[in-house]
Amino acid sequence: TTSATIAIEDSEVESDTKNSEDESNDDENSEEVEEIELGDKIVFGEYNGVSITWRVLKISPDKTEAMLVTDKIITMKAFDAADSDEYARHNGISYSSNDEEANANLELQAFIRGNSDWKDSDIRAWLNGEKELVDYGDSAPTKKKMSEHKNGYDIEPGFLSNFSKKEIEAIKPVRLETKANGLSDKEMVVTEDKVYLLTLEDLELFEKAGMNMLTKPTEECLEQDESKWYQDEQDGYGVEMHYWWLREPVLDSSSKCYAVGNEYWEEKIIENTVGLEGLGIRPAITVDLTSDVIFTKE
């Protein structure tokens, strides 16, 4: 009788344990499929050795896709490097930012200061680079081709090389239409990208998602940054937020793009020359929420 009683009790304990484990697994599964909402913080992929936190900007009506943008600036980089041997210098001639010839000659302007065309930009190549070596064509973004000869990224592995194969597969290629710059005879440039920068129109999504479009750099970004623009602005003006690039060009220029400002200046949107290496990068992606990847809320 005693043995039978013990066996029954052991069976009940095992049953209770199994039920407890099942409930625990159910809780874990419920967390995994927890519905993603606008403004949520999502952890996905990594860069600079740490996980990337993203914000949900947009969700498709059928809730199978979500547009994400990094919560903070993850790196400081020029949008595009000069094609000349050195920034603002060609054939032994130096061109200041106020140089009349360079400002009037759009081809020369793009050549010595960087080209604002998203399709052929260095930052597009880097963001979509899945390998250690990124193909920049005839001219790579070396330090010498940046405005202050800092933050070159010619030998830095492509952004997507930091992601697993499964994570890359979960990022959907998106057909993008971007306004053309002053050198083009077209109004729009069409590309297909997995990773991209936002446009002026995209900024409206922040308000719809209940989010502030102003942001600051990550600690890892500041450790990597050689320009120290953020620290200078912080020391000089006490700002916490920093500028970050959009992919939209200034139409009457070939070397300027729009960027989001910081909280110090009145203008929320600024124009800047694309060869300036002290502005931030906030990548955006569109992910497949039905993929095998678990998008974890922070």
Predicted regions and their residues:
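Ser/Thr/Gly/Pro-rich low-complexity, disordered linker/stalk segments of secreted
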Residues: 3-31
